[in-house]
């Protein structure tokens, strides 16, 4: 059998060089990192000897109100004196909230703490007590919760729209400097296969967006293999594995056995949401998918994927 002049070539992948950069973004609008437990809940109701958390609604709304005061001038004032006490013992539940000394255009807005290590924790705590009163939060040791509605938000003189997921709408709000309030659940309750409700809910803020571009550059080593004329025809059918001489010299004019070649650059873009989860900044640096139904997790078993609702267009 005669040898096929020129042989055939194949490429060995050595490695892929990857570089990702952010090419456009809305930086997280909410800079505070508040939470539900100590020191934020100091003095809150006690459930069987355990201090109740302030509640995710209280944290999300308080951070949102703190931001909106600077962004749209609403709300203007704060109650400088806020008091909460109460207890839960079995079926016995008592709650007492007192708000007084309302100060219009309060200077405390500019003195709010950034995180749990900052000063003036009491200012943020008082605002969470205010939210607890207006949203009728029910306090328990396992979690303090309340329903969110546009009418409750309107108690602060702020109007907004409630809707389901729409990428363009949410992004346009962020680009206008307006965060989005989110509510969702991680458990779907079913009876005989029929959904009867949802549980394990959470309220948080969607406040940032990123567009990232990834460049990939592959490096390969060329190998030349001698073949016979009888092999030539079937090798033409296996072009995904082998290059014929006329092909290899088109791609790599100076090809030689053992040459290291670069395939050139390929680019792909990805977009992500950024969240403020109300857990003292934990999980806030995680990037979340923007497609409908994307996993929004704070841990492997805490995916808030059910009944997502969005409050936006604050004015």
Which residue ranges define each predicted feature?
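Noncatalytic regulatory segments and standalone regulatory/sensor domains
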Residues: 1-21, 223-262, 266, 271-315
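Active-site-adjacent structural segments surrounding the nucleophilic cysteine of cysteine proteases
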Residues: 1-142
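Active-site-proximal structural scaffolding
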Residues: 49, 54-58, 145-146, 175, ...
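Active-site-adjacent substructure of cysteine-protease-like catalytic cores
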Residues: 159-269
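Extended interaction regions within the primary functional domain
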Residues: 153-154, 172, 180-183, 301-309, ...
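Extracellular hydrolytic enzyme modules, especially secreted metalloproteases
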Residues: 135-151, 156-157, 278-284
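Structural recognition of the beta-strand scaffold that forms the well-ordered cores
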Residues: 55-66, 126-133, 149-152, 160-163, ...
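Short loop/turn segments at secondary-structure transitions that flank enzyme active sites
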Residues: 62, 67, 71, 188, ...
